[in-house]
Regions:
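Structured catalytic-domain cores with a bias toward divalent-metal coordination
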Residues: 2-343
Length: 343
């Protein structure tokens, strides 16, 4: 079933699992067959926005007469995550302009997005490598080449000018939406100020590489820049687009970029904050949860069995343990789940 969603005057109709499964097969253990995922969204026509106005393909920037922060809203770090592209396309078509500061809207992995196929929607996450694992200076400054790394280098000069980034993402497996703020205090403050979705999680990222929110500009002890990643819901689902739009609107209000203030009659409660204390990375090709945990699920008791990684048992390290984005098709070397404690 497809659904419709209207915002900013626009009506919307509506490969991480594959990569992990392939990894398991290469290691000699057959991963279970992936389920068939419902695709409620259609990829938007981004052709009007490809030229942009910044000198970087797919990036468009608008400056207001009044001074203010430079805010970047970024979509398509992963080419199959359509929700962010739909939100930015709607913003551009609505001719939204900031009332202060500078607003930049960017589509990152356009080449992977161009390969999206609703019959195989997980395959176009990236072409050569995950674009959200290349954001350390050594990799960006090094000699290695890939389509995603080359594109990150194209985008980097814009990243180096922005004050705040909201990176729009979605998830393959069922999970409550959340904001990820990395390890920086400024990014934590920005995520709490955005406030929607109502869960903020601080973490150190993945063993496989650095995310955009881990880029040194946003994590350095000095400076003012901050970056937040919203995981707005499942890929290709209409409510995910609605959550992205809510997060974008909240950030623009926080930046003072919209004429109208937020609706104080519907002000949500303050978000909960949790900090990841342990990243579970699969060490074998036989990692398996004992049941299909949902992201955002809180496990009441310390010592609860969560998974087996070969012969090793994975158990909760404390009471009220938050499950952050469990991946149910995990190959060796990939993040299986993050365990977090509320504070």
């Amino acid at each position: 079933m497809c659904f419709g969603l209207s915002f900013w005057g626009i009506n919307v109709s509506g490969a991480e699992g594959v990569m992990d499964a392939i990894a398991s097969l290469v290691q000699g253990s057959a991963a279970p067959e992936l389920p068939r995922f419902t695709v409620e969204l259609a990829p938007p026509d981004l052709s009007p926005w490809l030229a942009g106005n910044t000198g970087v393909r797919g990036f468009t920037s608008f400056a207001a007469p009044r001074s203010g922060p430079h805010v970047l809203i970024l979509a398509l770090i992963h080419g199959n995550e359509l929700g962010g592209a739909i939100v930015l396309d709607a913003m551009l078509r609505s001719k939204l302009r900031p009332t202060r500061g500078r607003l930049t809207l960017g589509f990152a992995n356009l080449d992977a997005f161009a390969r999206f196929d609703a019959e195989n929607p997980i395959a176009s996450r990236f072409i050569d490598e995950d674009m959200n694992r290349v954001w350390d200076q050594a990799t960006l400054d090094g000699p290695r080449r890939s389509r995603e790394l080359d594109r990150a280098r194209e985008i980097r000069p814009i990243i180096d000018t922005v004050d705040w980034v909201l990176d729009l993402h979605s998830m393959l497996w069922p999970s409550d939406p959340l904001l990820l703020c990395g390890e920086g205090a400024r990014s934590k403050a920005l995520a709490l100020a955005i406030g929607t979705p109502g869960l903020v999680v601080a973490d150190g990222g993945h063993a496989g590489g650095r995310r955009l929110i881990d880029y040194p500009r946003f994590t350095a002890a000095t400076g003012d820049a901050a970056s937040v990643l919203v995981e707005a819901g499942q890929h290709w689902r209409t409510p995910t687009v609605a959550q992205m739009q809510a997060s974008v609107t909240a950030l623009l209000h926080h930046a003072g970029m919209l004429d109208a203030g937020p609706d104080t009659k519907t002000t949500p409660p303050p978000p909960r904050f949790a900090e990841v204390t342990r990243v579970i990375t699969a060490t074998t090709g036989r990692f398996a949860f004992v049941r299909p945990f949902r992201g955002g699920e809180v496990i009441p008791a310390r010592g609860t069995l969560l998974a087996h990684d070969g012969s090793a048992e994975i158990r909760t390290p404390y009471d009220d343990c938050l499950m952050v984005m469990p991946s149910h098709r995990t190959g060796r070397g990939h993040t299986a789940v993050r365990l977090a404690r509320f504070s």
